[in-house]
């Protein structure tokens, strides 16, 4: 999305947020009205307005200075995240107040209908709002408020290890027990804590897998974003190699370039960075992984996604691959698997993807698995199988736009391939 789109969307959000302020302010007045200290009441009420309006003004000022050549910086993402946090908190607070006010409306209407001939001249139609309603509103709104703040300060670097064993009837015997570490969606332009990123890399290194793969979106927009972290991500090594592909953000499509030549040079620089990192970038091509005299094919395509750039050419990538070979495909967007790969004439045993981030927000427990991204992507995180073809969608290593994660934590995937009996 370009600068104009960001400005329109977030100015609308900011305007609605400001309109909510008067309602929340009114609710807070009810909450503090019995306090003996007038000074403390003023601190709470005007402190709220100062924070709410201040964050909105800072964000709008940041958007107005947003560079079309760089896109959103960590500062812009922080301001956006604070604005979203306050916006959702105010909505939750206002909804609780609204429920109480609707009750007041019905009570007032009923009281008027029954006692209209007995009403005093200056008797108010609405009964006064009870302090209890404001107290409930504060308690309920505190849940998302503290949750989002946790996601911004800690959750976005709270790396989780997801280990899965995948079974295949036709896995070559030599690859029985073969391990793969996958990370995806690094989005290096959003990072703001090198030490925290290093902890994630150390966790990935500690797995000592046979193969390492990265499934796209090294940067948000421009090749220079990864440069401060080259020394860190180059630490990821594996005995059978490190392989990578491009994601939709790697092409630089979301910021302005002075010329096509400049944009092309940026992409070439990004490809060079993959080489410097020690990653073999697969651009609609394949390689053979050999172990114990047996082989499997690792295939990588450029980005192909529903509603996104569709540069990936699976037919080209499959050229030279033995039709009977065991095949693993790296494809950034899981919609490629949904629309093309699972129906492909030649069986591709396993596809590894990312892209969705799991929306960076959701719930994953033993009995409940939900994220708003499920309404956009059928396969938004984890494992899926259909027609004997398996898919794994990584939840992402980094974050984008919202500078945080809540419930859907950054992921490092370790897959163990096992041969199952026919």
Set out the residue ranges of the language-model regions:
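A short, flexible N-terminal coil/short beta segment enriched in small residues
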Residues: 127, 133-137, 141-167, 265-283
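Non-catalytic terminal accessory segments
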Residues: 1-156, 422
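Soluble catalytic domains of enzymes that build or remodel membrane lipids, polysaccharides, and related
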Residues: 170-422
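C-terminal segment of N-terminal export signals and the immediately downstream linker at the start
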Residues: 110, 143-181, 194-195, 202
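Amphipathic, alpha-helical segments enriched in basic
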Residues: 3, 7, 54-57, 61, ...
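Short, charge-rich amphipathic segments
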Residues: 28-38, 126-139, 163-172, 200-212, ...
């Amino acid at each position: 999305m370009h600068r104009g789109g960001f400005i329109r969307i977030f100015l609308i959000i900011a305007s609605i947020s400001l309109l909510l302020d008067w309602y929340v302010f009114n609710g807070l007045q009810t909450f503090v009205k019995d306090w003996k200290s007038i000074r403390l009441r003023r601190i709470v009420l005007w402190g709220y307005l100062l924070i709410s309006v201040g964050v909105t003004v800072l964000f709008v000022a940041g958007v107005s200075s947003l560079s079309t050549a760089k896109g959103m910086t960590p500062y812009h993402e922080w301001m956006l995240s604070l604005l979203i946090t306050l916006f959702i908190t105010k909505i939750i607070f206002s909804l609780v107040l609204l429920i109480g006010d609707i009750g007041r409306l019905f009570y007032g209407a009923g009281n008027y209908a029954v006692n209209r001939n007995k009403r005093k001249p200056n008797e108010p139609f609405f009964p006064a709002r009870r302090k209890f309603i404001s107290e409930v509103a504060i308690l309920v709104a505190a849940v998302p408020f503290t949750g989002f703040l946790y996601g911004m300060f800690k959750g976005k670097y709270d790396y989780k290890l997801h280990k899965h064993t995948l079974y295949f009837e036709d896995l070559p015997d030599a690859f029985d027990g073969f391990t793969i570490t996958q990370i995806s969606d690094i989005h290096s332009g959003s990072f703001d804590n090198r030490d925290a990123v290093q902890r994630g890399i150390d966790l990935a290194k500690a797995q000592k897998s046979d193969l390492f793969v990265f499934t796209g979106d090294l940067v948000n927009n421009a090749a220079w974003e990864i440069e401060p972290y080259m020394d860190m991500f180059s630490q990821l090594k594996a005995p059978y190699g490190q392989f990578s592909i491009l994601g939709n953000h790697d092409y630089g499509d979301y910021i302005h370039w002075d010329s096509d030549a400049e944009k092309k040079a940026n992409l070439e620089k990004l490809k060079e960075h993959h080489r410097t990192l020690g990653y073999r970038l697969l651009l609609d091509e394949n390689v053979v992984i050999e172990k114990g005299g047996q082989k499997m094919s690792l295939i990588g395509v450029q980005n192909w996604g529903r509603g996104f750039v569709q540069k990936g050419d699976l037919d080209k990538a499959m050229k030279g691959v033995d039709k009977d070979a065991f095949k693993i495909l790296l494809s950034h967007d899981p919609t490629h698997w949904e629309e093309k790969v699972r129906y492909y004439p030649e069986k591709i045993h396993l596809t590894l993807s990312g892209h969705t981030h799991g929306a960076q927000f959701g719930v994953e427990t033993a009995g409940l698995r939900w994220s708003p991204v499920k309404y956009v992507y059928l396969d938004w995180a984890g494992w899926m199988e259909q027609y004997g073809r398996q898919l794994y969608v990584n939840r992402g290593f980094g974050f984008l736009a919202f500078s945080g994660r809540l419930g859907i934590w950054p992921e490092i995937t370790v897959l163990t391939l096992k041969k199952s009996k026919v």
